């Protein structure tokens, strides 16, 4: 597709780091494992870990008086939504995920913001990346897994459908039932699941792509409709080719994907950069990998 609003020359489109040493921290048992072939680095890190660490403490969150500038005004946002609904009614598209951006000056470091999010809105695929040499940092509180590949099997867990938690267990249950029965929420979710199943089918054995589970998952502040889809990779495919088939995620684009990517480019009028991309890792030897979708994301430059 031909894009009207392309990244400027010099803009980062993605970053890949080849990692030969790293630290794995298990949240379940609070243990750390140092993985490297460099014994000097291992000794240095293990010695640092063994030292008594001062707990990281957060001060009261300061007030940000800087103006937040939206990419679209509320009026423009409503007008664009009406255009999208008309395009759906005309049969041009089935689903479009239109986003807005807010720009402002930070009064705290991205690292501190990430710690605040871990406390206020913990999410299973949260991400913090700091690359001072490249001039950017990413903070994401993402609940969504785009792709996991392990031992020849691939998994994706698309999210579409959201409601509040409510103020009580009874409220939460009622809101959940309303969301489950909502025709719009279920229709959007079905379309998304069909899209992701089709993407996986391109790299998986015939008949192996199935929905393992469809459920409501509860997070700190919201409830989501989530499907878990699994497939068995063809012998000639791997995690990288699966990623190429499934990226960008359907939940942040829409369907049909090629058409809606052109529509999104037209209505958002700027590149999305890292937001709605993915952060993750891939084993270059086995092809095993895990990638999230960078939603609920802050990009600092």
Model region roles, listed by residue range:
Residues 1-301:
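Extended alpha-helical targeting/anchoring segments
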């Amino acid at each position: 597709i031909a894009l009207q609003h392309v990244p400027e020359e010099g803009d980062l489109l993605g970053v890949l780091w080849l990692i030969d040493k790293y630290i794995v921290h298990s949240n379940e048992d609070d243990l750390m494992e140092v993985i490297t072939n460099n014994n000097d680095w291992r000794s240095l890190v293990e010695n640092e870990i063994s030292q008594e660490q001062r707990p990281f403490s957060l001060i009261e969150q300061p007030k940000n008086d800087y103006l937040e500038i939206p990419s679209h005004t509320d009026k423009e946002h409503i007008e664009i939504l009406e255009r999208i609904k008309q395009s759906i009614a005309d049969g041009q598209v089935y689903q479009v995920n239109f986003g807005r951006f807010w720009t402002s000056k930070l009064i705290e470091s991205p690292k501190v913001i990430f710690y605040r999010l871990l406390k206020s809105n913990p999410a299973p695929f949260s991400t913090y990346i700091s690359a001072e040499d490249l001039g950017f940092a990413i903070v994401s509180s993402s609940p969504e897994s785009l792709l996991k590949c392990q031992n020849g099997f691939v998994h994706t867990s698309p999210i579409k459908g959201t409601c509040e938690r409510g103020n009580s267990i009874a409220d939460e249950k009622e809101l959940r039932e309303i969301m489950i029965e909502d025709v719009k929420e279920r229709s959007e979710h079905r379309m998304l699941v069909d899209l992701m199943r089709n993407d996986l089918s391109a790299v998986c054995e015939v008949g192996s792509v199935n929905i393992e589970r469809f459920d409501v998952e509860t997070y700190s502040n919201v409830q989501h409709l989530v499907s878990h889809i699994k497939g068995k990779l063809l012998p000639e495919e791997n995690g990288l080719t699966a990623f190429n088939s499934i990226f960008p995620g359907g939940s942040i684009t829409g369907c049909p994907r090629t058409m809606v990517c052109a529509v999104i480019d037209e209505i958002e009028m700027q590149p999305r950069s890292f937001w709605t991309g993915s952060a993750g890792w891939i084993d270059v030897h086995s092809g095993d990998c895990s990638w999230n979708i960078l939603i609920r994301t802050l990009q600092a430059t």
